Amino acid sequence: MFAILHEACDNTHDRKKVYAMKFELMHPADQLVMIMNRIYQYGMTTTSGGNLSIRDESGDIWITPSGIDKGSLTRADINCVKPDGTILGPHKPSVELPFHRDIYRIRPDLRAIVHAHPPTLVAFSLARKIPDTHLVPDATLVCGNVAMAKYDVPGSEQLGKNIAEKFAEGHNTVILENHGVVCGSTNLFKAFMAFETLDFCGRLEIDAKKLGTPRSLTDAQIELESAKAHPPMDAFVARVISSEECAGRRDMCHLIHRAYDQRLFTSTQGTFSMRLSDGSFLITPYMKDRKYLEPEDIVRIKNGMCETGKTPSRAALLVQEIFNTHPEINSVIIAHPPAIMAFAVTDATFDSRTIPESYIQLRDVKRVPYASSSLDIEGTANAFCSSTPVLIVDNKCVIVAGASLLNAFDKLEVLEYSAKAVIAAQDIGKIINITPEEVKDIEEAFHLT
């Protein structure tokens, strides 16, 4: 049986190639290695911390080992625990196996569990508080109603009972007092999505509280966004793919991966788009993992029609309206980076007059009301102009427009870096912005109109 496990995909390039075959078709051991590598790479667990598991259709539990370096895990390290308790594999399974078993026993609908100790969520567990998942519309839909489980010794029977009790109540995401977080779902990627999204909410809330009082969405506002339908579009079959389109798909994927690695995106949040010379445009697909997006996943929109067999981002109509309204705009990026989103969920005003680069790239950043990007597409598109290439949508996202794909991405980076600097400055002293006279000098020197 374990001969299969030794046909290992032991480096990131190989894992990426396997992922392209569809995550759900990967062997459980490969899935566990890929997601654990991802969690460790982004500083969300330590060498010895955290454990993941998958329960397959036969009832076997595939689980990460105890005491093995999480930064260099291979599929050969993964244990398989049979329903009768037999353990297959070269290592001792995670000491947290008891609570994984308890959760699977009490919740037969769950097939995967993620447990780790990201610093942000550990901070909430120390304060015995739950991150506010109502700051942005999608978080509650992904994480569900988050619970808090009482503390006990790691690996103990009592800790397993404490956690299982919360899952028995119907929660899929549980913070453990003075410990970390546990997320369960019907597959490993969905469990990871909940884990990643809750961590994002925690980072957002911490940043927002440095600027003011975070503003939560009501259930009605969240429902308004969750009811948003995909834009109705006829399909077309692409007979010819130009070199320009091929290059655009390649470049989009390259920058999307960078955006994810820089934590400007999460696995399923974030939209890139790029206008082509024939008037059509490319856009990211709906609900596909941004970290491993491939050129063939990108969706082309032409004359209001969608490339057949694909589902575009729900922002496709907004992007189309922006391109139609502004011929000078050739790329639109929609993202939710936590630092700039801290401004979106508070009444704090973002002022780009911090350093010259910020003002040159961002100029006059404006904000628009929540849901306006869905309910008032024309008004949102008209809000852009040469001096306003960035919009902050309350409690939802930022929309960045550029003359090119790289130009828009550069603006997004500068926006988030500037927001981080402003938030960090709150602990240092009063911010002194560039003066109006100095702004005028910048405008003259860089020919800004």
Pin down the residues of each PLM region.
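Glycine-rich flexible loops
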Residues: 19-449
